[in-house]
Amino acid sequence: MIDLTGKTSLITGASGGIGGAIARLLHKLGSHVIISGSNEEKLKSLGNVLKDNYTIEICNLANKEECSNLISKAPKLDILVCNAGITSDTLAIRMKDEDFDKVIDINLKANFILNREAIKKMMQNRYGRIINISSIVGISGNPGQANYCASKAGLIGMTKSLSYEVATRGITVNAVAPGFIKSDMTDKLNEKQREAIVQKIPLGTYGMPEDVANAVAFLASDQASYITGQTIHVNGGMLMV
């Protein structure tokens, strides 16, 4: 049984479906959760569900100073889950430099800053769990998402490098790469589009946000103390690597 009692977890992008599921599960397992995002209303709604043992931190990940401050404001930090991310999809020949840059800045650079600042804090206690949320397309690629795929592939490479650097300090760094997870985005697909995607998934269905949360909870636990530098794929077999 996973027990996170006494641990403090910071989850970015907690106002979204996957981030909310992660926050709820880590909280259920006993962790104090710092839920962060840019949508205060949604964070407050999540807080109403959690009821206690949580803190809300509003943060704009496009602002480097806010990224650093988000970590420094936490009096204690045992678990960091970098879940926030954005998309700005179009074919490469139509993609503007600023569309590429803003996705890289939030999905990769902001997460690097969060990882770096969290490591500084975790090194003091010689303990930490960092979980970066990547994506299936960080491995497979996807047309119209050169910027997003680059950011998610970069996140996996960064995770591996950091895991080498901090392994002797009691800190593990891993990634979780979700496949097609049921969300507001997938709900907008028409029936034909949904069927085409499901046909590519051996388990024959979309994943749920809770499936991703379960992988995160395991990596955040002491049961995963001998796992670092790895990417856990939660995709129903859609991509086997």
UniProtKB/Swiss-Prot annotation:
<feature type="binding site">
    <location>
        <position position="181"/>
    </location>
    <ligand>
        <name>NADP(+)</name>
    </ligand>
</feature>
<dbReference type="GO" id="GO:0051287">
    <property type="term" value="F:NAD binding"/>
</dbReference>
<feature type="binding site">
    <location>
        <position position="135"/>
    </location>
    <ligand>
        <name>substrate</name>
    </ligand>
</feature>
<dbReference type="GO" id="GO:0050661">
    <property type="term" value="F:NADP binding"/>
</dbReference>
<dbReference type="Pfam" id="PF13561">
    <property type="entry name" value="adh_short_C2"/>
</dbReference>
<dbReference type="InterPro" id="IPR050259">
    <property type="entry name" value="SDR"/>
</dbReference>
<keyword id="KW-0560">Oxidoreductase</keyword>
<keyword id="KW-0443">Lipid metabolism</keyword>
<comment type="similarity">
    <text>Belongs to the short-chain dehydrogenases/reductases (SDR) family.</text>
</comment>
<dbReference type="InterPro" id="IPR011284">
    <property type="entry name" value="3oxo_ACP_reduc"/>
</dbReference>
<dbReference type="InterPro" id="IPR020904">
    <property type="entry name" value="Sc_DH/Rdtase_CS"/>
</dbReference>
<feature type="binding site">
    <location>
        <position position="83"/>
    </location>
    <ligand>
        <name>NADP(+)</name>
    </ligand>
</feature>
<dbReference type="GO" id="GO:0004316">
    <property type="term" value="F:3-oxoacyl-[acyl-carrier-protein] reductase (NADPH) activity"/>
</dbReference>
<comment type="function">
    <text>Catalyzes the NADPH-dependent reduction of beta-ketoacyl-ACP substrates to beta-hydroxyacyl-ACP products, the first reductive step in the elongation cycle of fatty acid biosynthesis.</text>
</comment>
<keyword id="KW-0275">Fatty acid biosynthesis</keyword>
<protein>
    <recommendedName>
        <fullName>3-oxoacyl-[acyl-carrier-protein] reductase FabG</fullName>
        <ecNumber>1.1.1.100</ecNumber>
    </recommendedName>
</protein>
<keyword id="KW-0276">Fatty acid metabolism</keyword>
<keyword id="KW-0521">NADP</keyword>
<feature type="binding site">
    <location>
        <begin position="148"/>
        <end position="152"/>
    </location>
    <ligand>
        <name>NADP(+)</name>
    </ligand>
</feature>
<dbReference type="InterPro" id="IPR036291">
    <property type="entry name" value="NAD(P)-bd_dom_sf"/>
</dbReference>
<feature type="binding site">
    <location>
        <position position="38"/>
    </location>
    <ligand>
        <name>NADP(+)</name>
    </ligand>
</feature>
<feature type="binding site">
    <location>
        <begin position="57"/>
        <end position="58"/>
    </location>
    <ligand>
        <name>NADP(+)</name>
    </ligand>
</feature>
<feature type="binding site">
    <location>
        <begin position="13"/>
        <end position="16"/>
    </location>
    <ligand>
        <name>NADP(+)</name>
    </ligand>
</feature>
<dbReference type="InterPro" id="IPR002347">
    <property type="entry name" value="SDR_fam"/>
</dbReference>
<keyword id="KW-0444">Lipid biosynthesis</keyword>
<comment type="pathway">
    <text>Lipid metabolism; fatty acid biosynthesis.</text>
</comment>
<comment type="subunit">
    <text>Homotetramer.</text>
</comment>
<dbReference type="GO" id="GO:0030497">
    <property type="term" value="P:fatty acid elongation"/>
</dbReference>
<feature type="active site" description="Proton acceptor">
    <location>
        <position position="148"/>
    </location>
</feature>
